[in-house]
């Protein structure tokens, strides 16, 4: 959120803490995404887990993006916001029966399957409805995302995806599962990735996996490369929109597509993070023997990331231009 664009007078009337979203910046970001992805005919599905605010979702849906969901609640939120079902993908390692049924009942675009057990459940539930579920296999590509360990998802020690060594047994299961149809492969290696070499390595690895699939007679219509593009938390005023141009260009340069293949992406944080701010007020100023504290009415109940894994979020004083002093900014939670 750009300092100087906050409606301070309006904020004075509101109870804090609250989240504020700059929908103009979000629209500018969506314009860039549509332009850069459109150069290559790429399909973009917004990862709803990044922010499920209804107004935010409605604006993204109006701009023609699809939705990447990891729960039944997110599928319903996407439908309510106007995302067409044929642009909704359903990922996640723990899909409950009711969530799978919700996807089946609404004829969503694809289920990103993360295990052999899940494949069997989807086949069984689709069979009860006399339907064929479109699936993509989320593979574990063994690509290091060069990001925080708690948001890395593409290594063999992670809970996500199917290890490459298990693919032969999964393919065999698909052959005897009449109510699923393999339409793609899916990979997502992590979040807040700012090193483009990770995406280059992913593209190269996908090429290798495609070659291996063809050796056993398999070719898929869709490649889903997930998301993960990072943002600049330290200088949000200078770089309010993520480097989507470089991001999509990496895959356009390196991916070896087969005729007719469609490419999909699932960005989340990079779409919405810079347009959002947590607005709080200072309740008390407290001076200890060794440090000074500014005590806010917001805590990790509103912003847990710094406490969870030392994530950095820039703090701005939007109601004063007085000289800066050093304080510990803390909340009411112990």
What are these regions (language model features)?
Residues 1-133, 172, 176-181, 211, ...:
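A charged N-terminal "starter" segment
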Residues 5, 261-334:
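Charged (often Lys/Glu-rich) extended helix/loop segments that serve as interaction or gating elements
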Residues 24, 47-53, 70-73, 93-95, ...:
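Active-site beta-loop-alpha junctions enriched in small/polar residues
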Residues 45, 134, 222, 262, ...:
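Hydrophobic "anchor" residues on beta-strands that sit immediately upstream
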Residues 61-62, 126-129, 153, 279-281, ...:
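Short, solvent-exposed amphipathic alpha-helical segments in soluble enzyme
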Residues 66, 89, 110-112, 136-138, ...:
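Structured core elements
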Residues 80-83, 104-105, 127-131, 150-152, ...:
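Solvent-exposed alpha-helices and their adjacent loops that cap or buttress functional pockets
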Residues 141-284:
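Active-site loop/helix belt of alpha/beta enzymes
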């Amino acid at each position: 959120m750009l300092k100087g664009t906050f409606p301070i007078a309006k904020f004075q009337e509101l109870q804090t803490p609250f989240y504020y979203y700059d929908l103009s910046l979000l629209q500018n970001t969506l314009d860039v995404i549509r332009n850069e992805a459109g150069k290559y005919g790429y399909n973009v599905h917004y990862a709803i887990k990044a922010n499920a605010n209804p107004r935010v979702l409605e604006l993204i849906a109006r701009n023609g993006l699809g939705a990447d969901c990891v729960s039944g609640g997110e599928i319903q939120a996407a439908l309510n916001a106007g995302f067409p079902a044929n642009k909704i993908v359903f990922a996640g390692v723990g899909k409950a029966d009711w969530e799978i049924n919700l996807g089946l009942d609404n004829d969503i675009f694809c289920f990103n399957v993360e295990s052999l057990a899940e494949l069997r459940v989807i086949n069984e539930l689709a069979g009860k409805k006399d339907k064929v579920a479109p699936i993509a296999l989320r593979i574990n590509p063994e690509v290091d995302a060069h990001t925080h360990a708690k948001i890395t998802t593409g290594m063999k020690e992670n809970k996500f995806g199917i290890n490459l060594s298990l693919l032969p047994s999964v393919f065999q299961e698909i052959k005897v599962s009449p109510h699923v149809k393999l339409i793609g492969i899916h990979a997502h290696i992590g979040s807040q990735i700012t090193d483009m070499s990770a995406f280059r390595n992913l593209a190269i690895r996908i090429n290798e996996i495609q070659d291996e699939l063809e050796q056993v007679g398999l070719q898929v219509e869709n490649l889903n490369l997930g998301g993960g593009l990072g943002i600049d938390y330290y200088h949000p005023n200078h770089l309010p929109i993520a480097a989507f141009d470089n991001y999509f260009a990496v895959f356009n340069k390196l991916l070896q597509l087969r005729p007719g293949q469609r490419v999909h992406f699932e960005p989340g944080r990079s779409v919405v993070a810079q347009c959002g701010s947590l607005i709080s007020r200072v309740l008390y100023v407290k001076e200890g023997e060794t440090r000074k504290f500014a005590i806010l009415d917001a805590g990790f109940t509103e912003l847990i990331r710094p406490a969870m894994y030392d994530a950095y979020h820039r703090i701005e004083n939007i109601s004063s231009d007085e000289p800066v002093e050093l304080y510990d900014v803390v909340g009411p939670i112990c």
